[in-house]
């Protein structure tokens, strides 16, 4: 009598676990879900040509960066969205990303950075 009840308990526990069974495994295994690409940050600025880089920073290649202006107001909406986002092409500075030609932005602010200037990469030294 103890053996069937033990088997039922084990089957019940097995059903309640969040194991990755053959029929419901994500591609790449259980940990692959953590490696999903981040979404792009909200568009902002004139004509929606820019992307948010922080709660009050909007940057676009053609327009430069707007910090704390009306063009960057939409970026405050990012604080209320559940998933993280990422703007810019390549990393730069201390935790920032290239926002416009020669400008590196992080959520804290923007600064000039030669790593974000495509022409400085080809200039002679």
Curated annotation (Swiss-Prot):
It comes from the Eukaryota. This is Oxytocin-neurophysin 1. Interacts with oxytocin receptor (Ki=1.5 nM). Interacts with vasopressin V1aR/AVPR1A (Ki=37 nM), V1bR/AVPR1B (Ki=222 nM), and V2R/AVPR2 receptors (Ki=823 nM). The modification Glycine amide is found at residue 28. GO terms for biological process: drinking behavior; eating behavior; female pregnancy; grooming behavior; heart development; male mating behavior; maternal aggressive behavior; maternal behavior. Belongs to the vasopressin/oxytocin family. Keywords: Amidation, Cleavage on pair of basic residues, Disulfide bond, Hormone, Signal. One of its GO terms (cellular component) is terminal bouton. The keyword Signal applies. Neurophysin 1 specifically binds oxytocin. Oxytocin causes contraction of the smooth muscle of the uterus and of the mammary gland. Acts by binding to oxytocin receptor (OXTR). PANTHER family: NEUROPHYSIN, OXYTOCIN-NEUROPHYSIN 1. Residues 1-19 form the signal peptide. Disulfide bonds join 20-25, 41-85, 44-58, 52-75, 59-65, 92-104, 98-116, 105-110. The keyword Signal applies. Coiled coil: none annotated. GO terms for molecular function: neurohypophyseal hormone activity; oxytocin receptor binding. It holds the Pfam family Hormone_4. InterPro entries: Neurhyp_horm, Neurhyp_horm_dom_sf, Neurohypophysial_hormone_CS.
